[in-house]
Amino acid sequence: MSLSIDVTSLPSISSSIFKNESSSTTSTLSGKSIGRSEQYISPDAEAFNKYMLSKSLEDIGPSDSASNDPLTSFSIRSNAVKTNADAGVSMDSSTQSRPSSNVGCDQLDFSLTKGVNVSANLDSCISISTDHKKEKSKKDKSRKHYPRIEADSDSEDYVLDDSDSDDGKCKNCKYKKKYFALRMRMKRVAMQLIEDL
């Protein structure tokens, strides 16, 4: 992946930024930038009034203020210095060290002599496994196999006395043995179901 930074659309930045050759030309920042001193002078109300009265109302805008306090703004502005790209920025500016030029003291000059080159490599590997092991569901695991009940179908020879049906006894039944075995198995299955629940 390659990343390039395009700064040609920014105001007042020359296209020589991407050349690796030194240039003595400087490009001026658009608007008014202030090179401030770390030493603040005490606000001079008389000089501030003279400065503000010398400007028309249309000329006073946001660029005239570097602080919310107008007097502090003026003291910063009076300490501003025009900087040179070769000489650097003076932090201890004084009235004597200010260059005598036609350019105002609220301007900052700069030059960039080195190119900007940003390069980065991005390697990524994604592996997706779609193998799915079929697992037995919990229902299948929890299902218990109950004993299968097998009973032969009764034939027409099956006889049950109506008189004995009330007390649950079968006297004249030829399937009496099979009947009791089946009833015993049914009872066991019913008891197993009740225990599981």
UniProtKB/Swiss-Prot annotation:
One BP annotation, GO: viral genome replication
Low complexity bias (residue ranges): 17-30
Compositional bias segments (type: Acidic residues): 152-165
UniProt: Mg(2+) binding residues: 92
Places the protein is found: Host cytoplasm
One term of GO molecular function: ATP hydrolysis activity
Protein name: Non-structural protein 5
Species annotation: Rotavirus A (strain RVA/Human/United States/P/1974/G3P1A[8]) (RV-A)
Lineage of producing organism: Viruses, Riboviria, Orthornavirae, Duplornaviricota, Resentoviricetes
